[in-house]
């Protein structure tokens, strides 16, 4: 793993960097590209340590500013008053310079890589982003994640294939991927990912199984949350511009799911 990332998450993030510029940038911060950067730093540090120190100071001075700073707090009114006082004292020590937006010029590229480690198991990821194919995102994405993850991939990758986990990753920004965890296979797992197309083409669960997947879908968006989790959700929605109206739209689209709509997604899988 890299920077504390779990291996299967590292595989997924690398996959996303093939088609999404934001994920490509993230590789430089915590992924395999970051690992390569650290290796280069270590290799050349003895030759010019001061140059590296100067670069770190420059980065630190750039990011430690109150410009566009957003703080999140979850707690009581009394705790907030204390937080406000402490945070304001901290903010006084930050810079006030404006941060200029920088263009990200590292283009995405499909690499289809494999990375060898000392482990005798694999973490296999394959996917894409459906919006690049002109397929819009809606609540059906969340329902498909439940159907593919709890039924097809669970049975084919985990039960039949022997992996510790077989997961469907389908996000509200259009990412669609198959992901395995502690998997003894590679080629077989990739073939099972491809088999999702046929599975969806022939999708026809019983009414009870269909409702089970419907309930499983809602458990991911309407589950009980702790105060800290509510704060994390609010923080994420703020920066991704996900409104409560959009969340309700997803709910309505999930409730409108039918076997016919599921089968209609087969060509894009």
What are these regions (language model features)?
Residues 1-47, 66-75, 123-143, 153-259:
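M16 family metallopeptidases and their MPP-like homologs
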Residues 52-60, 254-269:
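A short, acidic, amphipathic alpha-helical segment used as a generic capping/interface helix at domain edges
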Residues 55-57, 108-114, 163-165, 263:
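Glycine-rich, charged/polar anion/phosphate-binding loops
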Residues 55-59, 86, 143, 153, ...:
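Short, hydrophobic/aromatic alpha-helical segments in well-folded domains
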Residues 60-65, 115-118, 157, 267-269:
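A general structural signal for short secondary-structure junctions and capping/turn motifs
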Residues 70-125, 130:
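An aromatic/glycine/proline-enriched structural segment found at the starts
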Residues 150:
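Acidic/histidine-rich
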